[in-house]
Amino acid sequence: MDLFKSFGGKNNSKNIAKERLQLLLVHDRADVSPKFLEMIKEDILNVISNYVDIDEAGLNVEITKEKRSDNTYIPALHANIPIKKMKQVIR
């Protein structure tokens, strides 16, 4: 189930965020600059804040390398985004 479909609203913002996340996965390294990671956080917050109020103090976003079953590594984006409350979305 697509989480954002249940909120309705702007499909364009969702697609932009999806494309940006896919670009992250193309990179074969997990070591990124703090500036790059901060840009990712801001983009994610901008999209998600259309649907929910976020506790930014508890926000944690990081990129790691995870080992796959074939012993290769793939970058992974981990985001812990505490939600204060859901926003009312017109359907």
From Swiss-Prot:
InterPro entries registered for this protein in UniProt: MinE, MinE_sf
Keywords noted in UniProt: Cell cycle, Cell division
Family to which the UniProt record says this protein belongs: Belongs to the MinE family.
Top-rank lineage group of the source organism: Bacteria
GO process terms (BP): cell division; regulation of division septum assembly
Function (record text): Prevents the cell division inhibition by proteins MinC and MinD at internal division sites while permitting inhibition at polar sites. This ensures cell division at the proper site by restricting the formation of a division septum at the midpoint of the long axis of the cell.
Organism: Thermoanaerobacter pseudethanolicus (strain ATCC 33223 / 39E)
Statement: the UniProt record of this protein carries the keyword Cell division: yes
Keyword Thylakoid tagged: no
Name of the protein in question: Cell division topological specificity factor
